């Protein structure tokens, strides 16, 4: 009887260890994916920040590689340029890394849906407000250029607005998303205030 109990215990222990090993491998794989994503962000050509500098009073709207240059944070020209994911993010445990990746995904989906479903109508309203009508092509470029900068802004706010321990993840994700959405609106407003006449739609035809 004793031998059977020991044998059963050892089998259960071995099963538990194997499950934990699998879980650790999954976490390591997710951590590598996060590190790869961070490295990719650092290797990007900085969204031509050196040229645009996110200062809309100096902004010249130009096409570089087929895109427009829309700065997501005109009031803080150094925030994106100085943002380094690897240096700003402290060394945290794998579980926290996993939670951070999940939050990032939630926020990204929230803002991406906002850009797809709400911004086109908001952009049209702002065009009327600033008397700066865009044609469909330039309107598309504006939204897509902002979409490319979305991850940088999310990382920026996640590094500066820490999640409180008792804050539900969904509430924190919504809070960060709202900050990014406000940046989007400000960027569009500044863009429309300084848009060159040649980029405006032919509304008088």
Curated annotation (Swiss-Prot):
<keyword id="KW-0309">Germination</keyword>
<dbReference type="Pfam" id="PF10737">
    <property type="entry name" value="GerPC"/>
</dbReference>
<keyword id="KW-0749">Sporulation</keyword>
<comment type="function">
    <text>Required for the formation of functionally normal spores. Could be involved in the establishment of normal spore coat structure and/or permeability, which allows the access of germinants to their receptor.</text>
</comment>
<dbReference type="GO" id="GO:0030435">
    <property type="term" value="P:sporulation resulting in formation of a cellular spore"/>
</dbReference>
<dbReference type="InterPro" id="IPR019673">
    <property type="entry name" value="Spore_germination_GerPC"/>
</dbReference>
<protein>
    <recommendedName>
        <fullName>Probable spore germination protein GerPC</fullName>
    </recommendedName>
</protein>
């Amino acid at each position: 009887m004793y031998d059977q109990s020991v044998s059963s215990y050892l089998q259960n222990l071995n099963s538990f260890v194997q499950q934990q090993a699998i879980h650790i491998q999954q976490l390591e794989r997710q951590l590598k994916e996060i590190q790869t994503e961070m490295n990719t962000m650092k290797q990007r050509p900085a969204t031509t920040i050196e040229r645009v500098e996110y200062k809309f009073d100096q902004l010249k709207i130009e096409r570089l590689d087929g895109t427009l240059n829309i700065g997501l944070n005109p009031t803080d020209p150094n925030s994106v340029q100085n943002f380094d994911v690897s240096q700003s993010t402290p060394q945290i445990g794998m579980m926290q890394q996993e939670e951070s990746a999940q939050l990032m995904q939630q926020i990204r989906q929230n803002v991406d849906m906002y850009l797809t479903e709400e911004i086109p109508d908001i952009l049209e309203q702002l065009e009327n407000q600033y008397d700066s009508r865009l044609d469909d092509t330039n309107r598309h470029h504006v939204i897509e250029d902002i979409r490319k900068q979305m991850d940088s802004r999310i990382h920026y706010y996640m590094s500066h607005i820490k999640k409180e321990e008792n804050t539900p993840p969904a509430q924190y994700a919504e809070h960060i998303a709202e900050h990014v959405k406000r940046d989007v609106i400000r960027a569009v407003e500044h863009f429309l205030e300084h848009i060159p006449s040649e980029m405006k739609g032919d509304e008088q035809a």
